[in-house]
Amino acid sequence: MLFSSIFAEKNILMIKPILFITPILIALWLTGCWGYKAKQNKANADAQPEYEWGVAVNTPIGYPIRFYAAMVGGTPIVGELYTKKEEPDWGNAYGYESHSMDKLPKSVDMVWLSYKEDCFYRLKTAIDYEKIEKLFREGFDERVPNGEVRHKTYDTIVVGIAPGGVVVLWAGRGYKKITEIGRYQAEKIDLKEPPGLDSHEHLIFSKEDREEVLNSDLTIPKAVREANKNKPIPFGLWDSYRDHQYQWFPVYEIPNGKIGDVRARYWNGEAGTTLYTDFASYMSKEDFFYLEEPIEKRPLFKELVISYKAESGQKYLAKVWFDWEAVLTAYQEVFGKETDKVTAHLDIRVNRANTYLTF
């Protein structure tokens, strides 16, 4: 299932939900100035650079956790109870605790309670420091509210914790630029309550607190609780989001128009923006636009925001939301079992009346 809407600069045009992915997806054609804040000890050329960064924690909606203790590098996670009540809940760099100038992390050590599973997990592992440092050092270009393009860098290490002890780390900045660092597997542990805890420290071991958290609108929306009632925990779902990647790329068709910036969120939690100046004409067609780069595996769209100028000169903003099951089924039909041998592009077309998109 896919939903879309297009907003004009002056008039808002709501589009009826597109309840199917037609031969759309299925008809995929086979085929200067560094923006980071870093400082280095001049007396030691090998000193590790320092960046201004903080930690954010994500949990899927309906699956709250409480930390017993947690460190990301030398930075402690001060918060305890973490829960998400609205999207984006997976790959969101907002809600960080605090930022400070510090060395980037090389390891994590975290112990937490999974409320839905009623068990404790621990993850103690080295993480990919080289990848993290490269991401922070190289940064990315971003359009700021006044329309200028400026070079920015990441400012958050995002910790995603899903049922089954699944942990995904991203480098992020807000929710517009999110890049995966890696996926890690925690182990279940038998954590006993030590003596001498005060009433607050006791909460993580309290059955009463667990029931309160699982049945409170403050931690899990009522609609989510009712939808998940008597259903098993979908273990493996969050791995599925990142495991299903294919060799594909999007092509945008704007009839006699011009493409603007395109912002995308993916099901694996990553997100990014393609600036309009980075687009090229596809197959020499003036109103077909794509990013001219090597075709490589990429995750599946979750949300797409397309800005463009129509033939009339009117500017529009089109938003599309992709249903996981529908999108996954469509891609599987196209790519089959030999995913490494197939490449494809997804055609995204704006109709001439600027009222809906087709795929």
Give the ranges of each region predicted by the language model.
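Bacterial signal peptide processing site
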Residues: 34-36
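C-terminal motif of bacterial Sec signal peptides marking the signal peptidase cleavage site
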Residues: 29-32
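Low-complexity, Pro/Ser/Thr- and charge-rich linker/hinge segments at domain boundaries
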Residues: 127-169, 328-341
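Tryptophan-paired
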Residues: 68-114, 263-316
